[in-house]
């Protein structure tokens, strides 16, 4: 089930946020997992405090076994960003990639963070005997006590089809790259690099929107790494419903993209 970020302002502008009541689907215990990209992709906005509080309340009061997987790759582009993992550490598996922030896309330099005490391990421990027997058979070549294996260790083994667990993980060049990137960030006490990246992203975003003639409302939750533009919203504001109908019946979104690419060669 997909939950769409369809909330809009009274003036008809997108906020690219979820409707809080739409999150109530997560209250159903039959919903086992929630996958979140925060900040989002492609709109590139972080969750509001209200949405974060709603998720926390749902987990604590309605669905305590909800497994949350959050991709926080764009987090560094929002000052004072706070991850779902900070609010619900035991329920959350956090994925973070170095690639966007350090311009190393393609290398797949990423880490997975999981709290030592987590719902994933708890759910495995509470599986029925038949399922546990299946898992013992699957991971039996790795441990004499499969029942004590952590979820994250099982996941690493699964990445190499279990049998090749001894080759799991990134190769040395990728490990060294991540070590250097992380060390660089820790040593940059003044966040000089981060400020430079924020200025670069914001200048690119401004250049895009200035040339569209559209208005980009201020929003402290905007990462700005990507931008999603609803052409029909602006068509309606500038030219009315008849023009919107003409656009929808005459063109498709790719026409705009290809024309933009052609005219900027």
Where do the protein language model's features map onto the residues?
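PLP-dependent class I/II
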Residues: 1-265
């Amino acid at each position: 089930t997909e939950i769409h970020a369809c909330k809009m302002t009274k003036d008809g502008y997108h906020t690219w946020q979820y409707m809080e009541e739409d999150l109530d689907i997560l209250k159903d215990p039959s919903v086992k997992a929630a996958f979140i990209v925060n900040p989002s992709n492609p709109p590139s906005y972080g969750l509001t405090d209200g949405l974060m509080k709603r998720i926390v309340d749902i987990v604590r009061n309605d669905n305590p076994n909800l497994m949350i997987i959050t991709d926080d790759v764009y987090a560094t582009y929002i000052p004072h960003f706070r991850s779902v993992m900070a609010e619900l550490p035991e329920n959350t598996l956090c994925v973070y990639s170095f690639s966007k922030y350090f311009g190393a896309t393609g290398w797949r330099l990423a880490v997975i963070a999981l709290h030592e005490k987590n719902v994933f391990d708890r759910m495995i421990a509470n599986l029925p005997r038949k399922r546990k027997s299946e898992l013992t058979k699957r991971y039996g070549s790795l441990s004499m006590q499969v029942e004590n294996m952590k979820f994250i260790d099982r996941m690493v083994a699964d990445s190499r089809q279990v049998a090749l667990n001894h080759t799991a993980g990134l190769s040395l060049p990728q490990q060294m790259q991540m070590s250097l990137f992380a060390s660089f960030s820790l040593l940059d006490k003044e966040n000089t690099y981060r400020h430079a990246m924020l200025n670069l992203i914001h200048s690119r975003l401004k250049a895009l929107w200035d040339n569209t003639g559209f208005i980009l409302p201020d929003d402290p939750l905007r990462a700005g790494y990507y931008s999603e533009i609803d052409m029909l919203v602006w068509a309606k504001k500038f030219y009315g419903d008849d023009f919107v109908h003409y656009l929808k019946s005459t063109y498709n979104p790719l026409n705009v993209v290809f024309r933009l690419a052609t005219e900027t060669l």
